[in-house]
Amino acid sequence: MPELPEVEVTRQGIAPHLEGNRVEALIVRNANLRWPVPELAQNIVGQTILGVRRRAKYLLIDTQAGTTIVHLGMSGSLRVLPKNTPVEKHDHIDLVMQNGRVLRFNDPRRFGAWLWSELPEAAHPLLEKLGPEPLSAAFHADYLQAALKGKKKAIKLCLMDNAIVVGVGNIYANEALFAAGIHPEAEAGKVDAERLTLLTAEVKTILTQAIKQGGTTLKDFTNADGKPGYFAQKLHVYGRGGETCTECGHLLSEIRLGQRTTVFCSLCQTK
């Protein structure tokens, strides 16, 4: 599943081809995504793209008339192509631009979304309850300590809770907790301020590195020009259960936590 760095890399890749350009057509070949593509999505036709933003794992394509909200789901991707590029399997939507380019949405598993909103961002049901961006100044140790106060849930589950902080999915939660030396099952409300300071710093560092390297390549992700990401080469724990720890040589443990695979070093990471 594309996580925050992959979505941000996609945003950076498509924005220069969309911003300031006018939409010629919206072609919907298959409207049956996670939610049906609404008829109102056609309201973008004739509009000039004012900006392409990211909020959590949502891409927001802004126009004066409203905003197209795109979610890549489990296997979705957006690519900017010449207008006459032949359509391939799972190419469900084309946003055709007057500059001769097309933004093409491909999604084999169809868990992604293509929606339209004329509401303020803070009022949209998908966006209104989201926590701060992890790379913003609003995400810091004092904030996280207050957000976790009294919580008995595992710290990893809280780190992946979009109401607490957005966009820290399974890959990067595993990696940040390893870098901070925190056991993923540690009771969130009992993690002290010093370790939360380290954790917030590691979240920012790891996400920034992943964005710079084009995201993490797993089964499905390629960025906007079709190239894979390379951060998978840097992973210390994710996907490495049963292998040796890169720091101490101990075998990495693998468990299920919140129905997600969780990998950690029981020596380097403490509760």
Swiss-Prot record:
- Positions annotated to bind DNA: H90, R109, K151
Q: Where are the zinc fingers (FPG-type)?
A: 236-270
CC cofactor note: Binds 1 zinc ion per subunit.
Lineage top rank: taxon: Bacteria
Keyword Nucleotide-binding: yes or no? no
- Which intervals of the chain form a coiled coil? none
Question: What GO biological process terms does the UniProt entry carry, in alphabetical order?
Answer: base-excision repair
EC code: 3.2.2.23, 4.2.99.18
Its cofactor is:
Zn(2+)
What InterPro entries does the annotation carry?
Answer: DNA_glyclase/AP_lyase_DNA-bd, DNA_glyclase_Znf_dom_DNA_BS, Formamido-pyr_DNA_Glyclase, FPG_cat, MutM-like_N-ter, Ribosomal_uS13-like_H2TH, Znf_DNA_glyclase/AP_lyase, Znf_FPG/IleRS
One GO MF term, please? 8-oxo-7,8-dihydroguanine DNA N-glycosylase activity
Q: Which UniProt keywords apply?
A: DNA damage, DNA repair, DNA-binding, Glycosidase, Hydrolase, Lyase, Metal-binding, Multifunctional enzyme, Zinc, Zinc-finger
Catalysis performed (reactions): Hydrolysis of DNA containing ring-opened 7-methylguanine residues, releasing 2,6-diamino-4-hydroxy-5-(N-methyl)formamidopyrimidine; 2'-deoxyribonucleotide-(2'-deoxyribose 5'-phosphate)-2'-deoxyribonucleotide-DNA = a 3'-end 2'-deoxyribonucleotide-(2,3-dehydro-2,3-deoxyribose 5'-phosphate)-DNA + a 5'-end 5'-phospho-2'-deoxyribonucleoside-DNA + H(+)
Q: Where is the catalytic site? A: P2 (schiff-base intermediate with dna), E3 (proton donor), K57 (proton donor), R260 (proton donor)
Q: Which Gene3D superfamilies match?
A: 1.10.8.50, MutM-like, N-terminal (3.20.190.10)
Which family does the record claim for this protein?
Belongs to the FPG family.
HAMAP family from the xrefs? Answer: Fapy_DNA_glycosyl (MF_00103)
Known function: Involved in base excision repair of DNA damaged by oxidation or by mutagenic agents. Acts as a DNA glycosylase that recognizes and removes damaged bases. Has a preference for oxidized purines, such as 7,8-dihydro-8-oxoguanine (8-oxoG). Has AP (apurinic/apyrimidinic) lyase activity and introduces nicks in the DNA strand. Cleaves the DNA backbone by beta-delta elimination to generate a single-strand break at the site of the removed base with both 3'- and 5'-phosphates.
* Quaternary structure and interacting proteins, as annotated: Monomer.
Query: Which named protein is this?
Result: Formamidopyrimidine-DNA glycosylase
Q: Which organism is it from?
A: Shewanella amazonensis (strain ATCC BAA-1098 / SB2B)
Its lineage opens with: Bacteria, Pseudomonadati, Pseudomonadota, Gammaproteobacteria, Alteromonadales
Q: Which gene encodes it?
A: mutM
